Amino acid sequence: MLPAGDASDGEAAQPPACAIVLVSNGPGELSTWVRPLAERLHALQPLRPRDPRAACALRLVLVPCPNATGQEHRVARDWGLFERVLPAARFWWLLLRPRRHGPWPARGVVVFLGGDQFWTVLLSARLGYRHLTYAEWVARWPRWNDRIALMGPAAAGRLPRRWRQRAMVVGDLMADLSDQARQDEPLPAGDWVALLPGSKRAKLLVGVPFLLETADRLAALRPGSRFLLPVAPTTSVRELLAYGGPANPLLRGRAVGEPRLQDGELITPAGTRIRLLERHPAHGALSQCTLALTTVGANTAELGALGVPMIVLVPTQHLEVMQAWDGWMGLLARLPLLRRLVGVALTAWRMRHRGFLAWPNISAGRAVVPERVGPIEPAQIAAEAADWLDHPERLAAMADDLRSLRGAPGAVAAVAAMVRGLLPPA
């Protein structure tokens, strides 16, 4: 649906003359790539829906992704940045019959910001729009791109020489996150520890009780520690409370109490208070944390971009965590007859062959942040976190290392300028 406008205003009711179509997939890309670029584009020129009379509309198309939660389109709609948001479930129908999803202007630009790059090749060809790809590591279809924005020299080196005139190294889109985040409201003084258990049910089943117990133990070791937990847009406070209590099937048979909610804080049965952040993205608060305890995934990329030291946790004692992984291993882990037999073997194989799991480590090719994989326990992680907090110079060194990987800000502005350069003249 188009946003409602003044029905008596003929100019406002006119369809847009062009469209900028951002294409993405999972929740991490939406918060770290799509939203900053969309905000920048709105700041640079009039765009619908913020300006109903604008000649150009900003739209979002989501593509299939095994890591998606299915709620990304609702999250993006709430931002108020896009005239239209198309869920991933309708992507194939968009390719087959685009007119069924509303009128599409004759001219426009398709921008790849996550997923499989081939989807934007197909979509730009189907709509007859120009095409720009933001490539982290490799631009796979340079022949069918009008422009290519590259994250760094490594991606540029992988591009065939004949296509390099179309490309420009812009930097990491997430490098702007820290500067933007620090404009938000400051947290009260203290050593804040962020708890990030994940966004999907399989990870939350394991991550929430693990991190709540870790917080209890860390609070006992360091009573001055303060805790916050960003509530993923794909879950709710009520669900978090259920994951942390006896309703969690992984906790059956254990004498566990019920966490409760009071004044925007989750209070564990042991009395530890954890501030819940329902604003998304929570970059402002996260950027002020001294340390983060997080699962694998896009969380590690966001924390790295914000320069927040972290310990990355992959507890493998519950097979259910395997169901949150993508690809054939996650599918096998869901099979009721096979998952018990193959679970241990799959976990061992992945941990042996995958290498680094945290994005800062993958990007650097070395251990920038600690990864704790295996049958880890909350007491072990609490002791390690306390040791890090007792040595602020080590935390500062990790933060400096993360900032050096992030690179200089400015990528969002550079990509926005490339998008505008592909638009038809006004």
Predicted regions and their residues:
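Nucleotide-activated sugar donor-binding and catalytic core shared by glycosyltransferases
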Residues: 1-426
